[in-house]
Amino acid sequence: MKKIGMIRSGGQTGTDRAAMDTALKYNIGLCGWCPKGGWAEDYPEAPSLLARYPQLTETPSEGTSQRTLWNMRDADAILTIMPEGIASQGTVLGVREGTRLGKPMYTASGTGDIPGILEWLRSLPDGLDLCIGGPRESECEDAYRLTGEILEQVIQKLT
């Protein structure tokens, strides 16, 4: 059985999108909640994200908070990637909710955190539904690239 059974994400640009694209590249299951209509900052009109990522499910709300809260609720564990420690409002909400729910959590800021991520993941059960989140691209220009780099190395070292 794989360590990561499912990558869960809300589909926003930056960290979320890199997590989703990495899941697809490595044939890891993909799921997550997105705002009603599939809204993301680069896909403002329906069907938006849902045309590109049909694995996502719409929340009843068009706002982003419900998406964040529901993804935290439904995950087994939460990996937050905040390049250079940049924390957006949604990222802070996710960390607070994960803490409130008592979920296993790890926060990374760069590739130097890969050994810690690996150690943390190896301490958790196989088949994880892993929620991956962090800032959107408009809040951290390097979020997509850095998240993709981290996740590629982590997945390659887990297999």
Model-derived features: positions:
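Acidic/glycine-enriched connector segments
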Residues: 2-120, 124-129, 136-158
